[in-house]
Amino acid sequence: MLFFIKVFMKTILSVLLLFFIFASSFTLVVGLAGCRPDQIQALTQFKNEFDSSDCNQTDYFNGVQCDNKTGVVTKLQLPSGCLHGSMKPNSSLFGLQHLRYLNLSNNNFTSASLPSGFGNLNRLEVLYLSSNGFLGQVPSSFSNLSQLNILDLSHNELTGSFPFVQNLTKLSILVLSYNHFSGTIPSSLLTLPFLSSLDLRENYLTGSIEAPNSSTSSRLEFMYLGNNHFEGQILEPISKLINLKHLDLSFLKTSYPIDLNLFSSFKSLVRLVLSGNSLLATSITSDSKIPLNLENLVLLSCGLIEFPTILKNLTKLEHIDLSNNKIKGKVPEWFWNLPRLRRVNLFNNLFTDLEGSEEVLVNSSVRLLDLAYNHFRGPFPKPPLSINLLSAWNNSFTGNIPLETCNRSSLAILDLSYNNLTGPIPRCLSDFQESLIVVNLRKNNLEGSLPDIFSDGALLRTLDVGYNQLTGKLPRSLLNCSMLRFVSVDHNKIKDTFPFWLKALPDLQALTLRSNKFHGPISPPDRGPLAFPKLRILEISDNNFTGSLPPNYFVNWEASSLQMNEDGRIYMGDYNNPYYIYEDTVDLQYKGLFMEQGKVLTSYATIDFSGNKLEGQIPESIGLLKALIALNLSNNAFTGHIPLSLANVTELESLDLSRNQLSGTIPNGLKTLSFLAYISVAHNQLIGEIPQGTQITGQSKSSFEGNAGLCGLPLQGSCFAPPTPQPKEEDEDEEVLNWKAVVIGYWPGLLLGLIMAHVIASFKPKWLVKIVGPEKRKEDNPVRLFMTLDSRWDSFNNKKNVEQKSDM
C-alpha cells in the first residue's frame, strides 16, 4: 500500500510541476508526463539559457523521451534553429547524465568553443552537434564518451587534431567533415573494431594513413577523404580496405596521377569519387581493371581529353559525371547502351556530336542528361523516353524544338537556352504540364507567340523565354500556374499592357518585361498600390509605359519591404536534386552597367522602370522597400523632388535617377546609405550642394553633370567660393585713360619719395629716431591692411549667406 502511495504522490508532483511551468502557454505537453520533476526542471532551465522564441513549447519538448521506469531523460532532439545564444560551460544540459541520444544540430549557437561538459554525458550512444558554429579544439573530455556509436561534429569551425577518438571503441559512424582539422589521421582510427563510416572531407589533413595489417580486420564501408592536403602515398594503404562500398578521394592534392587499377580488389565498391585528381592515362582504357559493381562514378575535373573506354565494362553503372574536362569529338554510341544508365553529366567539355542513330539515345534509360556548355551543333536530338531533366544550354543546336519532346510525360526541367533554335514554341508542351517545373528557352531565335496552353494544376515555377523574336501577348493562362515564381520575357516583340492580373499569383518573385512593346499605365485602374505579394524583382525598362505613379504605389510590397534575408545560400529557382542544380538568371542594369546575374538570391530586390515615358513625382512610399538593392528610374519624365524617404532604403547599392526632370536639392540623407556604391542624378534640374558623404563624393563627375545648379564635390571644391570680378567691355576704354592719368601723376611723386628715402637711410636724423624709436615695430603696410579688411568683409558676407540659406 505504501508503494502505491509513493507512486501516486510522485505522479501528482510531476503533474503539478508541469502545470506551473507551462500554465502561461496554455499548452499541455503530454510527452513529459513520464519524466521526473528534476529532469523536467533541468530541461526547462536549459531552454531558458537561450532565446527560443522561434519555437513554441510543444515543438521544443516533442523531441524528449524519458525512461518509463525511472523517469530520467534518455533522448533529446531539438528542432533545427530553435535555440539562439551561447552554450554555457556549466549548462543544465550536462546534468541530464542518463542521456543516450542527443541531437542539437542546426541551431544558432553564438560562435564559441565546445563545452567540456559534454564529456560528463558518458552514457551517450548518439551525439549530433553539426552546423552550430563551434570553434577551437575538441575537449579532451570527449574521450570519456566510450559508449558512443555515432558522433557528428560536421560543419563547424573546429581545429586541431582528434586523438580523443582512440578511446571511442564502440564508434561505428564518425563525421568530422567541413571543419579545420589538421595534422595526420591517427593510426588508431582505422583499427576501431566497429567503425563502418568515416567522413573527413573538407579539412586540412596531411600525410598518409595507416591501414590495418589484415584487410579483413576493417569493417570500414564508407570512407570520405576529399578536399584535404594529403601528400604521401595515401592510395596504397587505402587499397587494402577491400570492404569499402563508398570511397571519396576528390581533390587530394597529391603530386602523382591515380591508377584506377589500384581499386581492382574492391569487389563491393559501388561509388567512387576521384574529382580534381589527375588520372593515369593508361588506366582509363577498356583494358584496365576496375570494380565491375560500380554504380556511381565521378570523374569531374580530372583533365580528361578522351572519352574513357573503361566505362564499357561497367554494366551496372547508373550515374557518371565527366563534367569540367576537355573531352572532344563525339559521344560514343555504345555509351547509351549501358543498360542501367540513369544520370549523365557531360557539362563543360568539347563534345561536338552524338555518334550513331538518334534512336539509341531515345531508347536509353537516361533520366537526367546534361549536355550544357559544349560545342554540339546541328538539329537538337530527340530526348530519351524516360527523361526527367534535360539541360543543353550554351551549345550551337539549330532547327526547331523536336515535337517528340512533348511525348516525354515525366519531363520536369527543360533548359535549351543559349542556342540557335528557330521556329515556334511547341503548343504540345501542355501535354506534360503536370510534371514541368522549369522551361528555359532564353537567347534563341524562336518566333511566333507564347502559347496560351496552361491549365489548372500546372506545376510551372520558372518560365524564361527572353531574347527571342516572340510576338503577341502574354498568355492569360499563366494564372493557372499557381506555383509560378519567375517570369522573364525580356528582349522580344511582345505588344501588351502591364499584366496587373499576375498579382493573383501568390509566389511570383521576379517579373522581367524589359525591351518589348508593352504600353499604357503601370498604375492600377483604382490608383492604388501595385502590391504584388512576394515580388522582389520588377524589370520593365525600355518599353512604352506612360502615366504617373500614385503616392501609395509601393505600399504593401510585402517581400521587398522586409529586411534582407541573412541566409545567402538560397537562390531563386534553386530546384535541386542530389545530381543537378538549376538556378534562375536575370539581366540587370546595375551600377551603371548591364550585366547578367546568375544565382539570384531570394532576398535580392531590384526595380528598373528606366527607358519609359513615366511622369509625375516619384512616390515617397518607395522608402518602404527596405530590402531594395538597386533602383533605376532613369530616362523618364519624372518631376518634383527626389524622395526624402530614399534614406530609409538602407540596403541600396545602386541608384539611377538620371535623365528626368527632377528639381530641388539632393536629399542629405542619401549620404548615410553605407552600401551605396553607385548613384547617378545626371541631366535633371537639381540645385544646391551635393551631399558630402564618402559614398557620394567618390562618384564620377558624370553622375552629376547636366544640372546647372549643382555644386560641391565631385563637381567642384565648394559652393561658396567668392566670384572673380570680370571687367565690363564698355568701361575698358575709360579704364585705360584713367590708368594713364594715374601713371603720369605717379612717376614724379615716386622719384621724389625715393630721393628722400635715400637721404633718411643714409643720415638717420636723431629727430626721426626719437619719434619712431629704435625698437618700435613697423606699422602695417597700408595696402596689406586694406586687403585684410576686404578679406574679412568677404568672409562676413559669405557666413551671412550660408546662415540665410540654412534658415531657408
From Swiss-Prot:
PROSITE patterns: LRR. Glycans are attached at residues 56, 68, 90, 103, 108, 144, 167, 213, 313, 363, 394, 407, 420, 480, 544, 632, 648. The chain crosses the membrane at residues 741-761. LRR repeats lie at residues 96-120, 122-144, 145-170, 172-192, 193-218, 220-241, 242-265, 266-291, 293-314, 315-338, 340-363, 364-387, 388-407, 408-434, 436-456, 457-481, 483-504, 505-529, 532-556, 601-625, 626-649, 650-673, 675-698. Pfam families: LRR_1, LRR_14, LRR_8. It is found in: Cell membrane. The keyword Heme does not apply. InterPro entries: Leu-rich_rpt, Leu-rich_rpt_typical-subtyp, LRR_dom_sf, LRR_R13L4/SHOC2-like, RLP23-like. It is a single-pass type I membrane protein. Keywords: Cell membrane, Glycoprotein, Leucine-rich repeat, Membrane, Receptor, Repeat, Signal, Transmembrane, Transmembrane helix. Residues 1-31 form the signal peptide. One of its GO terms (cellular component) is plasma membrane. The keyword Cell membrane applies. Residues 762-808 are cytoplasmic. Disulfide bonds: none annotated. PANTHER family: LRR RECEPTOR-LIKE KINASE, RECEPTOR LIKE PROTEIN 30-LIKE. Belongs to the RLP family. This is Receptor like protein 27. It comes from Arabidopsis thaliana. The gene is RLP27.
